[in-house]
A protein has these predicted regions:
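Metal-ion/cofactor- or nucleotide/acyl-coenzyme-handling active-site neighborhoods
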Residues: 2-241
Length: 241
C-alpha cells in the first residue's frame, strides 16, 4: 500500500522492501506499470512469493534472510516485526549516513481514533476508543490493537498509542541502540511517538534547497553497494541444509 501512496504523490522509490510471504500481497502491485517496477530495486525476504519477485528485473533483485539463516557468513538476524523496522535495520547495517523516517508515527489520531492512513488497504478502517486508557493494575486481558497507552511524542509532549505500536516503538529503540553507529544520523519526520536517539525533524522546507539527485547515478551506486554485500551462490555446506 505504501508503494501506491508514493506513486500517487508522483514519487518513484529507488528501493522497495517486502517482508511478508503471503501470496495475496501480489494484488498490491496491480495497477502499477511494469516499466516503473523495472526501475526499482527490490529487497525481499527469501519467503516472498515468486510471482512478486518476477515483477522486478533480476539484476535489481536482492534477497535477505529473516526467519532463518542459510548464508550465515553474510546474513544477520533481522529483529523487526514489520517492514518498517526491517528496512531501518538493513539501512543502519549498510552504513547509510543520514536516514529520514517518514510515516513512522506509531500512534493514534486522537480526534478520529484511526490507527492507519486512509491509503492502507487492510487497516484504514481501524478505530480505537481513545478514552479507553489501559491500566496495568487490571487483571483483564490486553487487546493489543484496541487498548490505549500514553507515550512521549515526537513533536508534542505526549501521544496516544496501542500496545501493539508500543512493541514496535521498543523494537525501533532496540535496533537503534544495537546497530546505529556514531557517524550515522537518524531523523523522525512523523508526528507521532518519540523514538530514542532519533532526532525529531520538521524542517521540510529545507529539502527544497537540496540539489536534484541524478537518479541514474544513485541507482548504480545502490546496485554496487548491494552487490558488494551479497552473494549469488550457495557453498556445499549451505546446499546440505
Amino acid at each position: 500500500q505504501c508503494l501506491h501512496r508514493l506513486l500517487n504523490e508522483n514519487i518513484i522509490p529507488d528501493i522497495v522492501t517486502i517482508v511478508d510471504g503471503e501470496k495475496i500481497l501480489y494484488n498490491d502491485f496491480k495497477g502499477i506499470k511494469n516499466s516503473l517496477l523495472k526501475q526499482m530495486i527490490l529487497l525481499a525476504n527469501v519467503n516472498v512469493d515468486s510471482k512478486i519477485l518476477n515483477l522486478f528485473t533480476n539484476k535489481n533483485l536482492f534477497l535477505y534472510e529473516k526467519e532463518f539463516l542459510i548464508k550465515s557468513n553474510i546474513s544477520k538476524y533481522l529483529e523487526g516485526f514489520t517492514v518498517g523496522e526491517t528496512t531501518y535495520q538493513i539501512f543502519l547495517m549498510l552504513g547509510f549516513r543520514e536516514i529520514y523516517l517518514v510515516g513512522t508515527d506509531m500512534s493514534i489520531d486522537e480526534t478520529s481514533g484511526k490507527t492507519h492512513d486512509e491509503m492502507h488497504k487492510y487497516s484504514s478502517k481501524n478505530r480505537v476508543n481513545t478514552n479507553k486508557k489501559l491500566s496495568y493494575r487490571k487483571k483483564s486481558k490486553i487487546n493489543q490493537n484496541k487498548d490505549v497507552l500514553t507515550v512521549e511524542g515526537n513533536f508534542t509532549k505526549n501521544v496516544l498509542t496501542t500496545t501493539f505500536y508500543s512493541r514496535l516503538i521498543n523494537n525501533y529503540n532496540r535496533i537503534t541502540l544495537k546497530y546505529k553507529m556514531n557517524e550515522q544520523e537518524v531523523y523522525n519526520m512523523s508526528d507521532g511517538a518519540k523514538l530514542k536517539d532519533i532526532k525529531p525533524y520538521s524542517k521540510i522546507k529545507r529539502f527544497y534547497k537540496y540539489k536534484l539527485i541524478d537518479k541514474n547515478k544513485l541507482h548504480k551506486k545502490l546496485i554496487k553497494l548491494f552487490t558488494e554485500t551479497s552473494e549469488n551462490k550457495f557453498e556445499n555446506n549451505e546446499k546440505q541444509m
